[in-house]
Amino acid sequence: MGFLGYIYNCIRIHVSLAPIVEWRPAQAGRQYRRFPMKIKALVVLFNGALLLLCMGTGYVLFLTPVRGTGWQSVRAYGIFFLIFLLLFLLINTLYVKNRRLLRYLDAEDWSALAALLEEEVFTRNRVALRRVSLLSESLILLSDFEALERLEHFVHAQRPRYIMKCALTFAVGKLLAGKYSELRTFMTRVAATQAPVQPWTRFYLAFACHLCGDFEQAHAHLLTLVHTKRQPLIRVLSAYLLSEVLPEKLRRAPAHDAQLIARGCAHAAQVRADVHAHYTPRRWADYENRKKQNVDVLVFLKLMQDARAWLFP
């Protein structure tokens, strides 16, 4: 699965958000494929490189004297060629076995890809984690949130542990479908299984609380996230929400806590100062681009743009 895993990791989605959520399937379809080379060409190049490496190794071994005769010489030369042969057979067997899937990827035919994976998962009951992950992302691209929900229920019944591993992808579906209450319930359940709670899990939970109108709970989660030193992007998104979005909404409450709002703004200012000490606008843009490789991050693209404008006015 290593080769297939590499291929799957080349398939990503770029999405857009309006003030809350705006899904544009046509735009996403054009940007979905970021891998610039056809997969078939990649396999041909790999085979060519493997052949050249095999010939080069054989030439070196031929020029290297080997003590002994008979089986000693055969073993000295043969072991290397056996390794190359096994690699050749492995790569090409995987390619032939998955040629339909790879052909749809090459053609960027996401409907056919989703249909193929649905047949594999639902009909043949081949519930592998990679298939579930790729199918869920394909369904998001197609805006088929009903099928994504069906997939979630099926996986929960067949492979419950995969739900937690693909939790953020299923969360994206609930977010784009506008099911904010379900998103909050789902992320609360996911967070309960993690110790400690993963930063992106907590951020999704905070965002769900915000969308459901529970601004105080969202504020509490975001105050925790601004201290996530190893996740600068989460820190900045949380700081932006604490500084520019939540204060106005919290002040609408008759008995709002002014000190709590001020503390959030102070933490946000500290985050901005920390980022300025380590990043220029160009370096930050490069950092964001490296992070834009997962649908669970890219779904916040509009929020990232607004946060960047706040960070570097």
UniProtKB/Swiss-Prot annotation:
Membrane topology label: Multi-pass membrane protein
Keywords: Cell membrane, Membrane, Transmembrane, Transmembrane helix
GO cellular component: plasma membrane
Bilayer-spanning residue ranges: 42-64, 74-96
Compartments, as annotated in UniProt: Cell membrane
Protein name from the UniProt record: Uncharacterized protein TP_0763
Native organism: Treponema pallidum (strain Nichols)
